[in-house]
Amino acid sequence: SSGSSDAFITKYDKNGNFVWARKFSGSDEIRGLRIAVDKLGNVYTTGSFEGTADFNPGFASNILTSSGNTDVFVSKLDSTGSYVWAKSFSGTGMSRGLGVEVDDQGNVYTTGFFQGNFDFDPMDW
């Protein structure tokens, strides 16, 4: 791992044969805690991270930086394991993403916890 721990996603076919694996790595700790797959095979994960983390498992990078505490992440990979997007949410204390679901329209829902104040829409300046 790059930091104290990295997160991974692996895909196997219905017969247990390996298809692909991807990792999220960073300067400190990344914990992948929940996964969901939509009807198109896109893969969504949530969990927590500290420090800086690269959520693009390909050749490019998408570096997210925590606010100094443990922050929430939500990410999306397509059915082939290619990066689509990743978001982070932070607050004044520790926070963690504990669940992720996708509805039939492709809307993504997350649940978790936070301490202190929390910014649910970091792009809303």
Residue ranges of predicted features:
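A sequence-level/structural motif corresponding to short, flexible coil/turn segments enriched
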Residues: 1-125
